[in-house]
Amino acid sequence: MSQVCQVTGKRPVTGNNVSHSQRKTRRRFVPNLHTHRFWVEGEKRFVKLRVSSKGMRIIDKKGIEEVLSDIRKRGDRV
């Protein structure tokens, strides 16, 4: 399963671990993703989304129905 938020589009980025002696080793910064079921009142069903913490806050603010319409406009299937 890909590490991409379905709401924000956040995905892993690369960077460095930096030790006290300034040695650098490559690493990945992965988004804080959770699989969550949301109740959609208009469709009378649950929708399962893989969202980041930021994506959950966006859903709380805008509402699940508006977020789903944005996802569907992008062409993603939900």
UniProtKB/Swiss-Prot annotation:
Transmembrane segments: none annotated. Pfam families: Ribosomal_L28. The keyword Chaperone does not apply. The keyword GTP-binding does not apply. Keywords: Ribonucleoprotein, Ribosomal protein. Gene3D superfamilies: Ribosomal protein L28/L24 (2.30.170.40). InterPro entries: Ribosomal_bL28, Ribosomal_bL28/bL31-like_sf, Ribosomal_bL28_bact-type, Ribosomal_bL28_sf. SUPFAM superfamilies: L28p-like (SSF143800). Residues 1-24 are annotated as: Disordered. GO terms for cellular component: cytosolic large ribosomal subunit. GO terms for molecular function: structural constituent of ribosome. GO terms for biological process: translation. Belongs to the bacterial ribosomal protein bL28 family. This is Large ribosomal subunit protein bL28. The lineage of its organism: Bacteria, Pseudomonadati, Pseudomonadota, Gammaproteobacteria, Oceanospirillales. The gene is rpmB.
